[in-house]
């Protein structure tokens, strides 16, 4: 049992080192320039150890995005606890995104790389589509709850969820390309507040 635990710990440490090295290289040099050899060299692992953890460079790319999205999901789950109304939950989600936005650092560059590779790499493309559909469905469920509880008036929750996701992704893209142009995280909070107000049952 003890040997198995130690092996699992070493395996997890190796995975973490590979991901950390890949994240830095993807952000600084780009996906295409980064090679498996360069990741292994920076992580201090053999290629055999790399391929034991990941079948390809693309799978490392996907794992980095999924790890980052897992933190976003935790923020969203936390925002839905406490029995607040849906508009207040969305405000809390936006605040969580704002927080992540300011601490994510190089991850935003990786997100841009991820989008760019979606046209050329089938694995990356599949995961990008899954990500978009996942969050579109999530926002639709949130809006449907708002309608059920009486806090929102939405005729087409699918369309409204698409609008919310488009606003979020559009602001993320602008923030990546022009990081000093605005406080993009704070702007996202304001934009989502306006969208929620437009769907609110309360009269202005």
Where are these regions (language model features)?
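Basic, helix-initiating cap at the start of DNA-binding domains
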Residues: 1-29, 33-45, 58-59
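Amphipathic alpha-helical segments enriched in hydrophobic/aromatic and basic residues
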Residues: 7, 26, 35-36, 47, ...
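Hydrophobic/aromatic residues within well-ordered alpha-helical segments
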Residues: 14, 57, 64, 68-72, ...
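Short coil/turn segments at alpha/beta junctions that flank glycine-rich nucleotide-binding fingerprints
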Residues: 28-32, 83, 104, 149
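Short hydrophobic/aromatic patch on the recognition helix
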Residues: 44-54
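Hydrophobic alpha-helical connector segments
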Residues: 63, 77-106, 160-164, 188, ...
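Amphipathic alpha-helical segments used for helix-helix packing
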Residues: 89, 102-126
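Hydrophobic/aromatic-rich alpha-helical bundle segments in the mid-to-C-terminal region
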Residues: 125-129, 133, 147-195, 199-204
């Amino acid at each position: 049992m003890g040997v198995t635990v130690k092996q699992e710990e070493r395996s997890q440490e190796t995975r973490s080192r590979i991901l950390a090295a890949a994240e830095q290289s993807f952000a600084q040099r780009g996906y295409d320039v980064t090679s498996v050899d360069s990741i292994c060299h920076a992580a201090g692992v053999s290629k055999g150890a790399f391929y034991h953890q990941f079948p390809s460079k693309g799978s490392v790319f996907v794992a980095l995005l999924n790890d980052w999205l897992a933190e976003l999901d935790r923020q969203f789950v936390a925002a839905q606890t406490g029995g607040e109304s849906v508009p207040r939950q969305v405000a809390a989600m936006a605040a969580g995104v704002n927080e992540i936005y300011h601490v994510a650092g190089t991850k935003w560059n990786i997100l841009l790389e991820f989008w760019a590779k979606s046209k050329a790499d089938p694995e990356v493309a599949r995961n990008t589509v899954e990500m978009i559909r996942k969050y579109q469905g999530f926002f639709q469920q949130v809006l449907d709850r708002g309608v059920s509880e009486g806090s929102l008036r939405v005729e087409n929750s699918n369309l409204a969820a698409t609008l919310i996701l488009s606003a979020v992704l559009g602001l993320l893209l602008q923030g990546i390309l022009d990081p000093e142009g605005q406080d993009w995280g704070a702007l996202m909070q304001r934009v989502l507040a306006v969208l929620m107000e437009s769907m609110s049952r309360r009269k202005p």
